[in-house]
Every structure is written in C-alpha cells, then in structure tokens.
Amino acid sequence: MRSTMLCLSLIVLLGQEPPKESWSYRSFASDFERVADSTSGLPMTERVRVFRSTFDKLYPSLYAHPDQSRLDGRIEKALTYFPSIRSTYDQVEPKFPEALANAMKEFRGAFPDFTPQMPIYLIHSLGTRDGGTDQVAGRKVMLFGADEIAQFHWDESLQPFIVHELFHIEHSRHFADCDQLWCSLWQEGLATYTASVLTPDASDHQLTLDVPHPIRRDADAHWGSALCWMAEHFDSTNPSEISAGFTGGPKPATYSGDRRLAPLPSRFGYYIGLRVAAQAAKARSLSELDRLDNQAARPVAARALAELMQASHLSCRLPAKQGSITYYAPRSP
C-alpha cells in the first residue's frame, strides 16, 4: 500500500459531469504500517519515538493529545496489537476510495447540493474512532479510522457506514454540536436514519446497531425503560450519561422509577435516535429535518420522543418541550 492524495472529482469516479467543487481524500493508513514494520525489532519506547517523528513530518498535529503519556499509551497499544488486525487492515486502504465514491454518489441522490467542505483522511486511529469530524492543526477534517473499520465495517456495512458519516458533514452546515444529550440523540439518530433510507432493507450490522452487541434486541426488551431514561436525561450535559448512551461507555445503571430495574445496552442512544428520527420523518421530509437548526430541532426531537412514549402508554415524565442549549463544553478526548 502507499499513501496517496486523490482529488475525487465525479468525472473520474462517478461517471458524471464534474462538480463545481472537488473534494479531497488522503490516506495515512500505510504510513502507520510502515512504521510498525520498520520498528518491529526495536524497544517499544523507540517505536513510539519513531511513530511520533514520522507523523510529525507527514502531518503535524494529526496525532495530537493534551496528555502525552496517554497518547504514548495508545501508540504502544496500536503497535502491539497491529498484527492481529493486519490481514483485514490491508484490505481497507485499497477498498476505501471506491466505497467512498459510491457512498458519495448515493448520498447526493438525497442531498444533490452536498460537497464536503473539509478534507477526508483515512488513518490508523489508535483505537479511538471508526469515523468522525475533528480539529487537526486548527482545521476541521473528517477522519476515518482504518483500524476500527477493519474490525467493524470491512464488509457490506462499509458503504452505509460512510453514508452515516457523510450525513454528519452535511448536517453540520445547519446544526451545531451542542452539549445536551438530546443533541447527540438528534445527530446520531438522523445519521442512522439516513443510512437506513439510502440502504434499502439495511441490516442492523450495516447500521452499526450490533456494536458491541445487538442493540435493537436489548433495547426493545426494555423499551419502556429505554425511552424513560432518554426522556429523563434529555437535557443532561453529564459526560458519563452521554457516554453511556452513545459511545459505548459505562452502561446506564438503570431506570429506577416505579418499575423494576432494567439494564440498557451500550450505545442504545443510536437506536432510540433512529426511532426518534423515523417518528419525526412522518411529518417532515429528510431534507427538512436536516435543515433544522438547534433551536428548531429541539422541539421536534422532544415531540417525536414523546410520541413514542405515548404510543407505549408510559407513565414517566415526557421530555420538556423547551430547554436551554449550550455549546462546546470541553470534554476529555
């Protein structure tokens, strides 16, 4: 494999007229592999040093972290476990550009004016992400993690996963990241819903609703508790609660109102978000939902969640119709 800079205009990869603006893609996946190979016989401290030196030259700040010791630990772990994912990892880089182009073509069928206003990079994420936007050297970029893709998306789920991430880029033009839990519910729910709409008969695997375990099954088994927990924490800015719902962090302990304790699965917020988005889509088109800003989206999300709760005849408190919205509270990377 080799690192490449590709200008992926539609005339080359999609067989259509060239767009007014092109979009850029670059892979650093093989650069990680070269570091892993060239340092395999060295002490780990030296391997980490070579990694840092190499990527500081290739793209300063690509692997920045305020806690240097924590970053070194991630580098060490990534180098140590790389052999276990290598066979699949090696398939990601050659497969990814075509999957990205196909996903872009599919996505523009629903959002014809879409053009990413940020570069797209494929990297070894050191186990931190399969995809997502981030700030690198003061610039907003889309990062795809080849290591996580190798574990979760190397099969038929790759293109729907890319569609999910492209929606986040599109949605960010209208909806800003905000601190409340409902913001993640809305963002991830709409992205998952978009992937489901653009992937007919999509499986839960294609929608990443099976990581780290089957989310739909476990959430449906405790559906009332899941909805009530989400309503209770709708405006929460507590990082541990948001992590519990969306990032595979500690499971929400329980919902312990007037009913028995019911464990909720990690990342269940993605599934609840999908159901909330589908409920909201009964009254508005996907394009209309995408274009709602934060102030307009909050009551729509709250109403959709409330309708799901009422349909299930739940007695717990509905989400508040109004609530404050704050932005950009610092979180631990």
Question: Which positions does each model-derived feature cover?
Answer:
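N-terminal mature-domain "stem" immediately C-terminal to a signal peptide or N-terminal signal-anchor/transmembrane
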Residues: 17-76
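Generic detection of long, well-ordered alpha-helical segments
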Residues: 90-101, 220, 270, 291, ...
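Acidic/His-rich structured neighborhood in mature extracellular/periplasmic domains
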Residues: 74-213
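Acidic helix-start/capping segments at beta-turn-to-alpha-helix junctions
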Residues: 49-55, 119-129, 212-215, 294-298
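Bacterial Sec-dependent signal peptides at the C-terminal "C-region" and cleavage site
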Residues: 7-20
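Sec-dependent signal peptide recognition
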Residues: 1-7
